[in-house]
């Protein structure tokens, strides 16, 4: 290369150094100073990775004094370039020597990089284009946020997430029965809200015992990095901000932290977009005295636009508290408890009509009359005629039924606020089998009972019942807490024998008290050396997690996990199928929560429930009431709380007094009332709610679409090529898994999300679900998203030169391929990307400026191209400059026409979708008060805002490829 002092060159490998100046030429070496950074580089004269910077007429250049010149003539004198042209501010004719060019010049624009000789490899151009297409495809997907999480494709979960996650500031109560996956539903909604930009700051409030579990679940299943906040974390955060909650976007904390006024005030001031409250059945409310927990959540719900409340047992604290939770979501709608009860009574007619439609049978005259009355504001005669016509197309009849069903659900009930799936409507649950193991009452307990009944006559009935249900507690209190009751309790003997006979099986043991759980662990360890671990409220979160992990460990792990009552809230152990209830809780909902730790979707075996109890005691009578009265062991009992409230007086009396006649009367009365409630619930509001909550055929179709996306082999190829280009080491580990490692030769110094010690990934959902240590890769995974961002936000692949070997074309024929992006800058929260995301526009010109892109596809053209080395590529560009400059203007004209078309299509799509939804909601609001005013005003504002953004849409040249025909 001919070098002379003062010439300007740019580094091909370190373009961030800016414009360099030759300051030394000695022998075989050349020294270049890069004034922008103050660094010198020494290069070999024959192999220097440098490109000479020479501008052309029409270009604008900047002097070191920051004035600009539009070049009209380029003169070379003594191996240096002098630019002649027009001063941009004064209009005068001026000259500028290349030594006086601005040092900070960056060749960021594709055309600048092309003419400066900064030409990328052919495969990088291709990967960049594929990345832009992939980003566009992801942004326009109606299922954005649903595919990425590592969860099973379960219809009702995906349906609820799809329905709720697309709303602006959703405010809903997720109340699926135990085991149906409320946490997953909430995670899917959170994931959607974040990916779509509808939410950025999220506060999750959970019981103290579940903080770490939520942290792990959000990361492992949803790739969301939450931070757990406690008092210590808040104190540490003061170093960064006066309000600790502003130091993180995604926060998990407990209600206990927010009981402190200072922390609550800070949380209220933290500008959250979405609040999630788990175990919301603990929020007790009465009109006269709402609980402190309720008041905290109420204050936050008044400040935070989006609210998700999670509970498996809506009525655990009574129907009033259930109403109060709905009141948190929409106080204007749920303003009066008595009015709410009257409205619930009216749901029966709606459910009857919905049943008639859902059955698929010919509608009776009574059903038609009911539907006509319920949908009086709409003419449904054509739909009814179609449904009743046996000769009509089956799909058309189904669609007519479905539309009327949706009209019913839209106009009546709490369908937009409350989602509750029952096991009756969801498939995939195991059989539950009860095994009772009566044991003889030991004399030690008989004595302790006798003494306790004499000494504790002052106790109220509830306290007395709790005592007789836990004889070991009475005995310990009786003997000053030092006695080892487990040495003589026959239930412990049975438990040891059971574990010894089932050594290969994992067993979950639940007892009411932490002291009981600890004593059982001691008994198993000291008497038989059985490996067991304990889980109780006195342990730290990390200790509980370790206990859970030790139990889950297949090889060398604990055979048994012994939980106190907290073990039946929030923790799931469906890898085990044997449950031992060492005692029974005095609450049907708590019993269901215990069983629900194993009886969940994903449980592959029947759940075996073992109940050792002391015969002829309160334990046996409570077992009989649960089993014979409620059938609560082998089936879920949605009416359990109602029955407990109605029969609690008789039940408590029966537990305290061993009277067979009282027990028989109690069991008969409970069974009869249970059947009544079962029939009433079938006929009433719950059935309507189920139809809306599980999604029916629509949910099945949604899951099928997601499953089809999982099989997209094109995505797999694109992602593998992306990692190849970046320089990620990929090692096949068999079983559809790949181990990724950062390499020393990666294109970028860091790859966020790729650990130093590597990560194992798979594109197979089933494998990812079966292996916690393997990440599921979809187009939504952070490793893919980050990889796309690394490529598209850098200069990688913005220029390329290739050769087309085709003897049917004259040698030397030129083609210019340009990739533009149609873009309208807008905040993510505006949802503009749904209508006009950055969209690649391809223009392929011949030397005469004809656009061939409609006739020559990218794929067919790309397959015929061959790479050329960089030195030859630079020469080809320089030789073609006179032809190329006019082509750029023509290409932009073609692209502008396409931009206008895209913008108008986006506007039509936006107007059609949003105005249609707005009109639908306005019509519904007249008959269903669950439609919030905020939703209507948000849609109107969003339409106006999107129109403004679309008006400012523009083109951006993203990449250029020069192609020359060769016969060589």
Swiss-Prot record:
Domain Helicase ATP-binding as annotated: residue spans: 163-332
PROSITE patterns, sorted: HELICASE_ATP_BIND_1, HELICASE_CTER
EC assignment: 3.6.4.-
Keywords: Activator, ATP-binding, DNA-binding, Helicase, Hydrolase, Nucleotide-binding, Transcription, Transcription regulation
InterPro entries for this protein: Helicase_ATP-bd, Helicase_C-like, Helicase_RapA, P-loop_NTPase, RapA_C, SNF2-like_sf, SNF2/RAD54-like_C, SNF2_N
A GO term, aspect molecular function: ATP binding
Top-level EC class: hydrolase
Motif DEAH box positions after renumbering to this chain: 278-281
Helicase C-terminal domain: residues covered: 491-678
Gene3D superfamilies linked: 2.30.30.140, 2.30.30.930, 3.30.360.80, 6.10.140.1500, 6.10.140.2230, P-loop containing nucleotide triphosphate hydrolases (3.40.50.300), Tandem AAA-ATPase domain (3.40.50.10810)
Family: Belongs to the SNF2/RAD54 helicase family. RapA subfamily.
Subunit structure and binding partners: Interacts with the RNAP. Has a higher affinity for the core RNAP than for the holoenzyme. Its ATPase activity is stimulated by binding to RNAP.
HAMAP family from the UniProt entry: Helicase_RapA (MF_01821)
PANTHER family linked to this entry: DNA ANNEALING HELICASE AND ENDONUCLEASE ZRANB3 FAMILY MEMBER (PTHR45766), SWI_SNF-RELATED MATRIX-ASSOCIATED ACTIN-DEPENDENT REGULATOR OF CHROMATIN SUBFAMILY A-LIKE PROTEIN 1 (PTHR45766:SF6)
Annotated protein name in UniProt: RNA polymerase-associated protein RapA
Organism: Shewanella pealeana (strain ATCC 700345 / ANG-SQ1)
């Amino acid at each position: 290369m001919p070098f002379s002092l003062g010439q300007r060159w740019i580094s091909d490998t370190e373009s961030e150094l800016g414009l360099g100046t030759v300051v030394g030429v000695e022998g075989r070496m050349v020294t270049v100073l890069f004034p922008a950074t103050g660094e010198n580089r020494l290069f070999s004269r024959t192999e220097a990775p440098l490109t000479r910077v020479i501008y052309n007429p029409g270009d604008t250049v900047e002097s070191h004094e920051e004035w600009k010149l539009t070049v009209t003539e380029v003169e070379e004198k003594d191996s240096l370039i002098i630019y002649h042209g027009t001063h941009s501010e004064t209009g005068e004719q001026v000259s500028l020597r290349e030594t006086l060019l601005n040092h900070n010049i960056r060749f960021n624009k594709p055309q600048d990089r092309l003419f400066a000789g900064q030409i990328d490899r052919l495969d990088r151009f291709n990967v960049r284009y594929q990345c832009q297409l992939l980003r566009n495809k992801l942004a326009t997907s109606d299922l954005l946020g649903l595919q990425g999480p590592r969860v099973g494709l379960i219809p009702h979960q995906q349906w609820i997430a799809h329905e709720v996650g697309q709303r602006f500031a959703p405010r809903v109560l997720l109340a699926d029965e135990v085991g149906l996956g409320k946490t997953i539903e909430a995670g899917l909604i959170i994931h959607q809200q974040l990916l779509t930009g509808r939410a950025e700051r999220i506060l999750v409030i959970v019981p103290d015992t579940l903080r770490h579990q939520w942290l792990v679940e959000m990361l492992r299943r949803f790739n969301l990095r939450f931070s757990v906040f406690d008092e210590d974390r808040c104190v540490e955060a003061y170093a960064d901000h006066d309000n600790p909650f502003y130091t993180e976007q995604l926060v998990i904390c407990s209600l206990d932290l927010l009981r402190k006024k200072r922390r609550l005030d800070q949380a209220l001031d933290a500008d959250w977009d979405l609040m999630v409250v788990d175990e919301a059945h603990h929020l007790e409310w009465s009109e006269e005295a709402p609980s402190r927990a309720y008041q905290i959540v109420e204050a936050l719900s008044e400040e935070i636009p989006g609210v998700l409340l999670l509970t498996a047992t809506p009525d655990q604290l009574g129907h009033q508290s259930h109403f109060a939770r709905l009141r948190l979501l929409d106080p204007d709608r749920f303003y009066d408890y008595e009015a709410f009860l009257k409205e619930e009574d009216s749901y029966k007619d709606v459910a009857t009509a919905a049943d008639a439609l859902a059955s698929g049978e010919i509608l009776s005259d009574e059903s038609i009359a009911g539907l006509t009355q319920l949908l009086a504001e709409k003419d449904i005669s054509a739909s009814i005629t179609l449904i009743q016509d046996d000769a009509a197309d089956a799909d058309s009849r189904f669609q007519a039924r479905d539309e009327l069903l949706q009209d019913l659900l839209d106009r009546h009930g709490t369908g937009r606020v409350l989602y509750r799936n029952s096991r009756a409507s969801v498939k995939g649950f195991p059989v539950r089998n009860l095994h009772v193991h009566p044991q003889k009452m030991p004399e030690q307990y008989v004595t302790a009972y006798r003494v306790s009944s004499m000494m504790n006559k002052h106790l109220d009935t509830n306290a007395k019942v709790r005592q007789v249900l836990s004889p070991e507690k009475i005995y310990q209190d009786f003997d000053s807490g030092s006695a080892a009751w487990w040495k003589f309790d026959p239930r412990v003997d049975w438990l040891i024998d059971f574990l010894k006979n089932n050594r290969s099986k994992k067993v979950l043991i639940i007892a009411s008290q932490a002291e009981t759980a600890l004593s059982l662990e001691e008994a198993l360890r000291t008497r038989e050396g059985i490996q067991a671990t304990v889980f109780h409220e006195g342990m730290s979160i990390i200790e509980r997690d370790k206990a859970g992990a030790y139990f889950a460990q297949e090889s060398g792990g604990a055979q048994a996990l012994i939980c106190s009552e907290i073990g039946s809230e929030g923790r799931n152990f469906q890898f085990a199928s044997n449950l031992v209830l060492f005692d029974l809780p005095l609450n049907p909902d708590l019993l269901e929560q215990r069983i629900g730790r194993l009886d969940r979707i994903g449980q592959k075996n029947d759940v075996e429930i073992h109940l050792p109890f002391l015969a002829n005691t309160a334990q046996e009578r409570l077992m009989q009431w649960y089993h014979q009265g409620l059938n609560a062991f082998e089936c879920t009992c949605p009416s359990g709380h109602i029955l407990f409230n109605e029969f609690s007086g008789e039940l408590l009396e029966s537990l305290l007094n061993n009277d067979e006649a009282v027990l028989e009367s109690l069991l008969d009365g409970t069974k009869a009332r249970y059947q009544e409630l079962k029939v009433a619930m079938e006929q009433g509001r719950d059935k309507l709610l189920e139809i809306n909550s599980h999604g029916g055929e629509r949910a099945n179709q949604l899951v099928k679409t997601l499953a089809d996306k999982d099989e997209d082999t094109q995505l797999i190829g694109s992602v593998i090529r992306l990692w190849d280009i970046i320089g990620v080491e990929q090692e096949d580990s068999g079983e559809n898994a790949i181990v990724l490692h950062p390499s020393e030769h990666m294109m970028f110094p860091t790859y966020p999300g790729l650990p130093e010690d590597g990560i194992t990934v798979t594109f197979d959902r089933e494998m990812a679900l079966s292996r916690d240590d393997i990440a599921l890769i979809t187009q939504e995974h952070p490793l893919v998203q980050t990889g796309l961002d690394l490529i598209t936000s850098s200069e990688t692949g913005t220029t390329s030169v290739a050769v087309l070997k085709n003897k049917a074309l004259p040698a030397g024929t030129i083609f210019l391929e340009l990739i533009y992006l149609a873009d309208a800058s807008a905040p993510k929260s505006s949802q503009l990307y749904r209508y006009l995301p950055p969209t690649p526009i391809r223009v392929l010109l011949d030397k005469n400026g004809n656009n061939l892109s409609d006739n020559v596809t990218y794929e067919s053209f790309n397959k015929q191209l061959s790479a050329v080395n960089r030195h030859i590529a630079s020469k080809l560009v320089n030789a073609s400059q006179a032809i190329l400059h006019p082509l750029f203007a023509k290409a932009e004209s073609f692209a502008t026409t396409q931009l206008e078309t895209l913008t108008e299509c986006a506007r039509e799509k936006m107007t059609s979708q949003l105005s249609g939804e707005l009109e639908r909601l306005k019509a519904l609001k007249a008959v269903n008060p669950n439609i919030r005013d905020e939703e209507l005003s948000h849609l109107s504002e969003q339409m106006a805002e999107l129109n403004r953004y679309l008006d400012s849409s523009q083109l951006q040249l993203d990449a250029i490829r020069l192609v020359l025909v060769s016969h060589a």
